[in-house]
Amino acid sequence: MAAAALRFPVQGTVTFEDVAVKFTQEEWNLLSEAQRCLYRDVTLENLALMSSLGCWCGVEDEAAPSKQSIYIQRETQVRTPMAGVSPKKAHPCEMCGPILGDILHVADHQGTHHKQKLHRCEAWGNKLYDSGNFHQHQNEHIGEKPYRGSVEEALFAKRCKLHVSGESSVFSESGKDFLLRSGLLQQEATHTGKSNSKTECVSLFHGGKSHYSCGGCMKHFSTKDILSQHERLLPTEEPSVWCECGKSSSKYDSFSNHQGVHTREKPYTCGICGKLFNSKSHLLVHQRIHTGEKPYECEVCQKFFRHKYHLIAHQRVHTGERPYECSDCGKSFTHSSTFRVHKRVHTGQKPYECSECGKSFAESSSLTKHRRVHTGEKPYGCSECEKKFRQISSLRHHQRVHKRKGL
């Protein structure tokens, strides 16, 4: 079996005819059903690729095929390859027509004319398969994730949505049968003149916008198949618990962690220092103080940090970025926490109040230092003379005395 060689023009635009393989009647009769199916798939995918690249071979000034312009209509009786098919109805142009006409002959494979039952693949939306190929196709999904990549999305022949009356391969209103597996049919629009969402080809191929929205999160998707895949990842159950602040969660452990914000409950205890936390994640981060773990490294100076947000703030030292600017005085800051404290200079706000004497402070660290006046706590001890101090600044000042003596 010899196929005609591909012809590539030296100059000019490549047309669909240039990349298509043509068969004579004798050669076509020698092809098996599997070979004809393969020929059909390859030809349709080539057509999709040519159209997506703008290499459409239609009439001059004619736009590339849109989601309402490409369809293949097939009469009930079997035609011979390369037979004359009306170019106005059966194919986009006279050059593609004879080639696409060959594809119509695949319609009689595996008992299509016997109106055998077709099956829908749940993972691939409305794509239809006969009984034998359906089971073979289902095996392809075993051990793989159902999401399909963008390259596959671009294959027009694999993504056209069909509207079928029942599960028969014959469209009941016209009495004409269609090549369901080709993926290039428009049935309902042919009879009603209207375009149904189920007959629209994927908007990604045609450069359209996302028309399918998720009712749960309002995200938009280019195809209904992708939307279906997204919806499978959403929680299938209603939120089991609601908080007084309006937040909800379908997971009880997440809700319990959130509740700790309101109840001040701290059920997680550090086994080393006894400090309490309202969530397990906060406890794990705290334990890095005891273990010395610093998993976040600066690529510029190789410094390590316990928290990711500390690394992000540190990197602004290298970039010079100061994203937080005071609208009152024009000062800018690298840290949001420093900026918040600075704003209190202008507002006079002092939210931290001492319960012993009623004195207020703008920073929590200032209140902590002040409390030591009442408690008598002196946590900073000198390693040379064992003197203790309430503030670390006082300790550093004292240590200079020992350095001078050592000189």
UniProtKB/Swiss-Prot annotation:
<feature type="zinc finger region" description="C2H2-type 5">
    <location>
        <begin position="268"/>
        <end position="290"/>
    </location>
</feature>
<dbReference type="InterPro" id="IPR036236">
    <property type="entry name" value="Znf_C2H2_sf"/>
</dbReference>
<dbReference type="GO" id="GO:0000978">
    <property type="term" value="F:RNA polymerase II cis-regulatory region sequence-specific DNA binding"/>
</dbReference>
<feature type="zinc finger region" description="C2H2-type 7">
    <location>
        <begin position="324"/>
        <end position="346"/>
    </location>
</feature>
<feature type="zinc finger region" description="C2H2-type 9">
    <location>
        <begin position="380"/>
        <end position="402"/>
    </location>
</feature>
<dbReference type="GO" id="GO:0008270">
    <property type="term" value="F:zinc ion binding"/>
</dbReference>
<feature type="cross-link" description="Glycyl lysine isopeptide (Lys-Gly) (interchain with G-Cter in SUMO2)">
    <location>
        <position position="266"/>
    </location>
</feature>
<feature type="cross-link" description="Glycyl lysine isopeptide (Lys-Gly) (interchain with G-Cter in SUMO2)">
    <location>
        <position position="198"/>
    </location>
</feature>
<feature type="cross-link" description="Glycyl lysine isopeptide (Lys-Gly) (interchain with G-Cter in SUMO2)">
    <location>
        <position position="176"/>
    </location>
</feature>
<keyword id="KW-0539">Nucleus</keyword>
<comment type="function">
    <text>May be involved in transcriptional regulation.</text>
</comment>
<feature type="cross-link" description="Glycyl lysine isopeptide (Lys-Gly) (interchain with G-Cter in SUMO2)">
    <location>
        <position position="308"/>
    </location>
</feature>
<dbReference type="Pfam" id="PF00096">
    <property type="entry name" value="zf-C2H2"/>
</dbReference>
<feature type="zinc finger region" description="C2H2-type 1">
    <location>
        <begin position="91"/>
        <end position="113"/>
    </location>
</feature>
<dbReference type="InterPro" id="IPR013087">
    <property type="entry name" value="Znf_C2H2_type"/>
</dbReference>
<feature type="zinc finger region" description="C2H2-type 8">
    <location>
        <begin position="352"/>
        <end position="374"/>
    </location>
</feature>
<keyword id="KW-0804">Transcription</keyword>
<feature type="cross-link" description="Glycyl lysine isopeptide (Lys-Gly) (interchain with G-Cter in SUMO2)">
    <location>
        <position position="251"/>
    </location>
</feature>
<feature type="zinc finger region" description="C2H2-type 2; degenerate">
    <location>
        <begin position="119"/>
        <end position="141"/>
    </location>
</feature>
<feature type="zinc finger region" description="C2H2-type 3; degenerate">
    <location>
        <begin position="212"/>
        <end position="234"/>
    </location>
</feature>
<keyword id="KW-0677">Repeat</keyword>
<feature type="domain" description="KRAB">
    <location>
        <begin position="14"/>
        <end position="90"/>
    </location>
</feature>
<comment type="similarity">
    <text>Belongs to the krueppel C2H2-type zinc-finger protein family.</text>
</comment>
<keyword id="KW-1017">Isopeptide bond</keyword>
<dbReference type="InterPro" id="IPR001909">
    <property type="entry name" value="KRAB"/>
</dbReference>
<dbReference type="InterPro" id="IPR036051">
    <property type="entry name" value="KRAB_dom_sf"/>
</dbReference>
<feature type="zinc finger region" description="C2H2-type 4; degenerate">
    <location>
        <begin position="244"/>
        <end position="262"/>
    </location>
</feature>
<keyword id="KW-0832">Ubl conjugation</keyword>
<keyword id="KW-0862">Zinc</keyword>
<protein>
    <recommendedName>
        <fullName>Zinc finger protein 552</fullName>
    </recommendedName>
</protein>
<keyword id="KW-0479">Metal-binding</keyword>
<keyword id="KW-0863">Zinc-finger</keyword>
<feature type="zinc finger region" description="C2H2-type 6">
    <location>
        <begin position="296"/>
        <end position="318"/>
    </location>
</feature>
<keyword id="KW-0238">DNA-binding</keyword>
<dbReference type="GO" id="GO:0005634">
    <property type="term" value="C:nucleus"/>
</dbReference>
<keyword id="KW-0805">Transcription regulation</keyword>
<dbReference type="GO" id="GO:0006357">
    <property type="term" value="P:regulation of transcription by RNA polymerase II"/>
</dbReference>
<dbReference type="Pfam" id="PF01352">
    <property type="entry name" value="KRAB"/>
</dbReference>
<dbReference type="GO" id="GO:0000981">
    <property type="term" value="F:DNA-binding transcription factor activity, RNA polymerase II-specific"/>
</dbReference>
